[in-house]
Amino acid sequence: MALVTSFNMANPQPAIEGGISEVEIISQQVDEETKSIAPVQLVNFAYRDLPLAAVDLSTGGSQLLSNLDEEYQREGSDWLKPCCGKRAAVWQVFLLSASLNSFLVACVILVVILLTLELLIDTKLLQFSNAFQFAGVIHWISLVILSVFFSETVLRIVVLGIWDYIENKIEVFDGAVIILSLAPMVASTVANGPRSPWDAISLIIMFRIWRVKRVIDAYVLPVKLEMEMVTQQYEKAKAIQDEQLERLTQICQEQGFEIRQLRAHLAQQDLDLAAEREAALQAPHVLSQPRSRYKVVEAGTWAEETAAESIVEELRPSQEATVKDDMNSYISQYYNGPSSDSGAPEPAVCVVTTAAIDIHQPNVPSDLFSVDLPLKLSGNSTCASATSETTSHSTCGSVTRAQSASSQTLGSSTDCSTPREELLPSKPRSSPLPLLLPPQQLVAEATVQDLMSSLSKDPCPSHKALDPAPLAQPTPLGSVQTSPELEHRVSLFNQKNQEALPVLQINPVIHLQPTAGLEEKFRSLESKEPKLHTVPEA
């Protein structure tokens, strides 16, 4: 059983699927091992240690028989084998039984009483009629009882063995008492008959009264042995429980270590969740930052939308750059290049003063703004037109970039043959404008139409010379040729534009046309100024 237990401890069964814990499995193993422990049998006991109680012959008898045979073979006392053999165990159990010992004690008391009466009759201390006949009957009864005692002693010697019988001092004393009580009675009976005073020597048989102790032991020893067996079982169970306790303690320590690791992991996860929560709380502040109110909205493919958005990003003005919306600064830029205090980028080609009308947002006041529109134009009939919130692509392939101090950036490149309806971003091609519009939007529409009508007089403004001379003081009426200083400035300006953009073949933006009169140019621009700086009342 100990080997089985150690094997179970060395090779623990794996956890059964289905929710049964390892602790329950261990408890079940302990219960099974406790039930499988057989009760302790009365084996390998010496004669003086065996109880006098009734023993189960089916279990204890066969075990005693086998153990006695082994002991006889070991000690070499083989004289009992031919006589009794394996039946000696049955006789041993019978001789050690409590019933036999109780009967023997009763016989001892009876023979003592009979021998005492016989002694009183023989000494004539007790006289009554037929006393001598009664004394003879008592004599023969006492002789029979003493003969039974002698037979029991011989049976003990035969069953237990001469050497075991001699080793047990109490049994030797008991046998001596029986012989000393039986021998004088037999001798007196043979010599003198039943009437002999020597029969009183048989009273020595009263020393067999010690058999009472055997009777008491016959009832006490079974309980004692039973308690000893229970104690042994509990000791074995305690040893098993101690082993299981050590194992469970080890399992608890491992689980405690694992629990500490999991708690540390959960603490780290809590820190990560807290960091993510803080980031999520800061996200609305990032999303709520002000953005540009211009957004490219154009029906087309994804590539076109992406290109338009990239163009709008390029057209957004930098916050650091501050351009003075002044006509004098524009003129100084035409002649001298970008000024140091204007903050405009160097690759600016030209500046066109026009109106930027936010049609999509009617809440914005419809004041006119001056927009710096650096144009990069090629010579294959491309033109620039200022529109709001839209970038349109055309066959010319030119890109217009615009920057403004009012944070409104508009740019478009379109073909010269584009009709007037295509220049309006807020007006779809397939559907007309709604009939009922807000007043501010109507004002914006009217302003844009006026601007487009002024620009549509020349189908391609890029081919017409944009001469800054009318913006200055007018020259005398008869002068057709321009001054050499103005020609020099225009040539420097065109050369700078060509050097700044070496990739594109750019024709000079400003052409000096000697045939056109300066007064006519000034008059045409003067007629458009009220429309640029004032909003007509609708």
Swiss-Prot record:
SUPFAM superfamilies: Voltage-gated potassium channels (SSF81324). In brain, present in the granule layer of the cerebellar cortex. Localizes on the post-synaptic side of glutamatergic mossy fibers and granule cells in the cerebellum (at protein level). Residues 397-417 have a biased composition (Polar residues). It is found in: Cell projection, Dendrite; Perikaryon. InterPro entries: Ion_trans_dom, TMEM266, Volt_channel_dom_sf. Residues 124-130, 191-199 are extracellular. The chain crosses the membrane at residues 103-123, 131-151, 170-190, 200-220. Residues 1-102, 152-169, 221-538 are cytoplasmic. It holds the Pfam family Ion_trans. GO terms for cellular component: cytosol; dendrite; perikaryon; plasma membrane. PANTHER family: TRANSMEMBRANE PROTEIN 266 (PTHR46842:SF1). Voltage-sensor protein present on the post-synaptic side of glutamatergic mossy fibers and granule cells in the cerebellum. Despite the presence of a voltage-sensor segment, does not form a functional ion channel and its precise role remains unclear. Undergoes both rapid and slow structural rearrangements in response to changes in voltage. Contains a zinc-binding site that can regulate the slow conformational transition. This is Transmembrane protein 266. The gene is Tmem266.
